[in-house]
Amino acid sequence: EMTSSLVGSEMCIRDRMNATEDVEKIASMVDFVFCAVDMKKDEIKALEERYAKAECPVVSNNSAHRHTPDVPMVLPELNPEHIEIIPSQRKRLGTKRGFIAVKPNCSLQGYVPALFPLSKFGVKDVLVCTYQAISGAGKTFKDWPEMVGNIIPYIGGEEEKSEKEPLRIWGHVDDEKKEIVPATSPVITCQCIRVPVLNGHTAAVFVKFKKNPTKEQLIEALKNYSGVPQELNLPSAPKQFIQYLEEDNRPQVSMDVNYENGMGISVGRLREDTVYDWKFVGLSHNTVRGAAGGAVLCAELLKAQGYITKK
């Protein structure tokens, strides 16, 4: 049975409801659902649409609908305007309340938030290597002992997500086409590596710019960036979205992964590069900002903007 994994609701655990079979009953009892299930992609797509069509908004951690044209993929500080596509989605689904919104993959949370405020300098080409914690695979060292003292240079599907999903975040809502049109730049190439760390995804990032910013301009842009969640003072929003660390040995997982209760992004080691223009290191908490916390913040944004309402 998939009970609490879908809705995280005490009543579903108590009543032993099955999240894949009792859709209409669950949808009638809750204001919205979070979805994070281990199923085939086409099954997840169908399940999330069933909840939406049952007039129950869905905030999804799954990748199934991340490229559905009228489903917003939201990183709340970066592209909150994408939720404006929801009325078009509701029209397609034939719903009044129901819709689907998704959050992006955990792998990109350590570098896309840092690149976003730098886009005013014309981000052109990006090379990134991510070093991803084992909790991203739902594992601990106890049940994945082969990861102790080991590195695996492959994580299935992560590199494609890490290259394509940022372009959708950088995209725009096309009112005429009634869809989100992905951006065509920057060009991103990525390698994703599994490392023996429990929590925290680190990214080594190399960037070419159309303009020629100074180090001071880049750091100022990072430190001063804030988004709608900060303006609205949403409960889960970090006060300072991005922190820049001056020390040469930061950010570190052991010292910085829980910055702003795991909802903030840590950046450091910004310096000029001999092949690209600039390089830096980013760090995010993959199971907080990159998963559950990011979904909660997305739901808070949707409630604040009137898309999730109490029945």
Report residues per predicted region.
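Active-site-lining helix/loop region of Rossmann-like oxidoreductase modules
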Residues: 9, 28, 109-230
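Rossmann-fold NAD(P)-binding glycine/threonine-rich loop
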Residues: 42-95
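Single conserved hydrophobic/aromatic residue that forms the stacking wall/gate
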Residues: 1-8, 13
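Rossmann-like NAD(P)-binding element
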Residues: 21-46
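Conserved acidic residues
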Residues: 31, 56, 98
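Glycine-rich, N-terminal phosphate-binding loop of Rossmann-like dinucleotide-binding domains
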Residues: 36-37, 62, 104
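C-terminal active-site/capping subdomain that shapes the small-molecule cofactor and substrate pocket
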Residues: 190-194, 199-311
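Short alpha-helices
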Residues: 87-122
